[in-house]
Swiss-Prot record:
This is Cell adhesion molecule 2. It is found in: Cell membrane; Synapse; Cell projection, Axon. One of its GO terms (cellular component) is neuronal cell body membrane. Residues 27-119 form the Ig-like V-type domain. The keyword Disulfide bond applies.
Amino acid sequence: MIWKRSAVLRFYSVCGLLLQGSQGQFPLTQNVTVVEGGTAILTCRVDQNDNTSLQWSNPAQQTLYFDDKKALRDNRIELVRASWHELSISVSDVSLSDEGQYTCSLFTMPVKTSKAYLTVLGVPEKPQISGFSSPVMEGDLMQLTCKTSGSKPAADIRWFKNDKEIKDVKYLKEEDANRKTFTVSSTLDFRVDRSDDGVAVICRVDHESLNATPQVAMQVLEIHYTPSVKIIPSTPFPQEGQPLILTCESKGKPLPEPVLWTKDGGELPDPDRMVVSGRELNILFLNKTDNGTYRCEATNTIGQSSAEYVLIVHDVPNTLLPTTIIPSLTTATVTTTVAITTSPTTSATTSSIRDPNALAGQNGPDHALIGGIVAVVVFVTLCSIFLLGRYLARHKGTYLTNEAKGAEDAPDADTAIINAEGSQVNAEEKKEYFI
């Protein structure tokens, strides 16, 4: 009886150990994603294994490897590692047909399995842009289509103009004939203008198989447009006697032909003085007859455009002496005049002398100097009149000749009595002069 109880206990102990061991013997796998044409690594691990065999099989339930023994003749499939705890194999040059569920089997009682799904990404082809025919005229409607095939899952298409993304452009995806990959297309519509000339329109394909390097296609636009014309003067304030250059700045595609210059609707009136060189009109020296409207015309195969410039020739401003110099001229003139009153014979020469410092750098008539000279002449005249009057006043009186001696009312025959000064205090005092 005791022996039977002991046997039963041993049986349950063995069953418990087997159950515990079988719970630790469970294969572990992971799903794998690989780009078409790449290499996939399939790994199966067992934490606790009592020398039980491991096996990998493909979605068609074909055995690939049984422990370290290769079962399927496929040169793309190689053994990476084989042990009681791990069985790893590699599949190179993966194709879309390799995608599916792979099984790792642990041959215990019962057999335990673990699934690993192999996902193969289809790489999109390089995109192509169609719909552009050069050249395009300004104002036309442009329609560009970008298409790419072979992506799995379907790729995304984005549009850019000079690296600036164009938002909200729709795209269409279609399943390919193999029912595994997709063809994606997108159409961009916009109306072109001259600012679009030379712009690079880019179609970019984004896909998880491309990592950080997207597929791109580029189309550089060529837009033809009529010329734009602008006249630029060499000076904003043209003056009489100065040269003037008018530059006709014209832009267009195709490049405009040589520009045409006209004045007031006709030809240039003075070709010798108005020289056209390329896009420039050079007026050698300006005068009042040059006033008018100058027109520059530029023409290309698309059309014609023009610009106008109204020329007004301004007078050269008079260069006058500063007002602070005039008092110094007057002072110098007065000083010279004092010398003239003591030497009348030198008056003509002295009055014509000009102050060289005051007149330095003057080309026109000096009105200030003329006014100073007039003032000197007037001053000299007034001084002469004053001296003459004083002289006559001093010699005022009555004079008698020898013939008047016999007169009855004559005081003395040999004496002439002259009144010295009418304004003196002693009016009776007389002086005698002999003639």
